[in-house]
UniProtKB/Swiss-Prot annotation:
The keyword Ribosomal protein applies. The gene is rplV. This protein binds specifically to 23S rRNA; its binding is stimulated by other ribosomal proteins, e.g. L4, L17, and L20. It is important during the early stages of 50S assembly. It makes multiple contacts with different domains of the 23S rRNA in the assembled 50S subunit and ribosome. Keywords: Ribonucleoprotein, Ribosomal protein, RNA-binding, rRNA-binding. This is Large ribosomal subunit protein uL22. The keyword Ribosomal protein applies. Belongs to the universal ribosomal protein uL22 family.
Length: 128
C-alpha cells in the first residue's frame, strides 16, 4: 500500500529542492543563502561557482536540483527561473567532548543545518 497523494502546496510556476543534514552552522549557511535570494537562477549558479565558502558546493547542488525539478517535473522554462526563496533551518547538534586539563572536559558542538530552495518562473516583461 502506498501513501495517499498529497495536494501540491506550491503554485504551478514554482519548484523546490531540500538539502538536509548539511554539516555547517545555520548562521554560516545563511551567509551563502543570502547571496542567491531573489537572483536569476543562472546568475546564482555563477555566484556559487566562484564563492570561496566551503558550503557553497552543497548550496549549488541543491539549486541545480531545484532547477532540474522545475524542468522535468513541472515543465517550467529554465531561462526564466528566479530563486524566490532560500530558507535555512536548524538541524541536529552533535555533542562531542574535548579533554581539558585537571581531568575536566569541554563541550564541542557540531551543528547541522537544512536548506530549502524554491525557484519561480517569471513571465518575460514586454518591452515597448
Amino acid at each position: 500500500m502506498s501513501k495517499p497523494k498529497r495536494e501540491r502546496v506550491l503554485p504551478d510556476n514554482e519548484a523546490k529542492a531540500v538539502a538536509r543534514m548539511l554539516r555547517v552552522s545555520p548562521q554560516k549557511l545563511n551567509l551563502v543563502a543570502q547571496l542567491i535570494r531573489g537572483r536569476k537562477a543562472a546568475a546564482a549558479l555563477a555566484d556559487l561557482q566562484f564563492s570561496r565558502k566551503r558550503i557553497a558546493v552543497d548550496v549549488k547542488k541543491c539549486l541545480e536540483s531545484a532547477i532540474a525539478n522545475a524542468e522535468n517535473n513541472h515543465d517550467l522554462d529554465v531561462d526564466a527561473l528566479v530563486v524566490s526563496e532560500a530558507h535555512v533551518g536548524k538541524g541536529i547538534v552533535m555533542k562531542r567532548f574535548s579533554p581539558r586539563g585537571r581531568g575536566r572536559s569541554g563541550r564541542i558542538l557540531k551543528p547541522f543545518a537544512q536548506l530549502t530552495i524554491v525557484v519561480r518562473q517569471v513571465e518575460a516583461e514586454a518591452s515597448a
